[in-house]
Every structure is written in structure tokens, then in C-alpha cells.
From Swiss-Prot:
It comes from the Bacteria. InterPro entries: Exonuc_VII_S, Exonuc_VII_ssu_sf. Heterooligomer composed of large and small subunits. The keyword Transmembrane helix does not apply. It is an enzyme of class 3 (hydrolase). The gene is xseB. Disulfide bonds: none annotated. This is Exodeoxyribonuclease 7 small subunit.
Length: 84
């Protein structure tokens, strides 16, 4: 039976659940009512996944904006020569 997706679950879990629903629906062996419930849950999971992707994109944009103000310096690494 279809369950309501938890809004706190991560993107990967959401994607796996959505893929499972798609597989069940593609098999075509579900009774109509169960197929409708699976479809409804799939729509909810797709929306949740889209929200997660949008949140990630916003976070990336914020991080990129912050780094525009602070240019990156070349990494020189640890200089162990001469420190022995």
C-alpha cells in the first residue's frame, strides 16, 4: 500500500522510492485502486524531489556568490622540505 512520503527524507531515498513506484506501474499488474494510490504517491515524491533539487541549487548559488567576494588563492600545499 502507498505511504505518504516523509518531507524530511533525503533526495536519494526519494528517488529510490519513486523508481520503485515507476517499476510497479510499468509492470501493469496492479489493481486499479492500488495503481492510483501508487501514482499519487509518485506525484508527491516527484514534487518532493524537485523541492530538494531547488534547495540544493539555491545553496550552490549562495555559496558561489560568497566566493565572488573572496577570490581563491593558489594552494601551495605543505612544504615539508627544509622543515625537518
Amino acid at each position: 500500500m502507498a505511504r505518504k512520503p516523509a518531507s524530511s527524507q533525503d533526495f536519494e531515498t526519494t528517488l529510490v522510492q519513486l523508481e520503485n513506484i515507476v517499476t510497479h506501474l510499468e509492470n501493469g499488474d496492479l489493481p486499479l485502486e492500488e495503481a492510483l494510490k501508487e501514482f499519487e504517491q509518485g506525484v508527491q515524491l516527484a514534487k518532493l524531489g524537485q523541492e530538494r533539487l531547488q534547495q540544493a541549487e539555491q545553496r550552490i548559488q549562495i555559496l558561489l556568490q560568497k566566493t565572488e567576494d573572496a577570490p581563491l588563492n593558489d594552494y601551495k600545499g605543505n612544504d615539508y622540505e627544509g622543515n625537518a
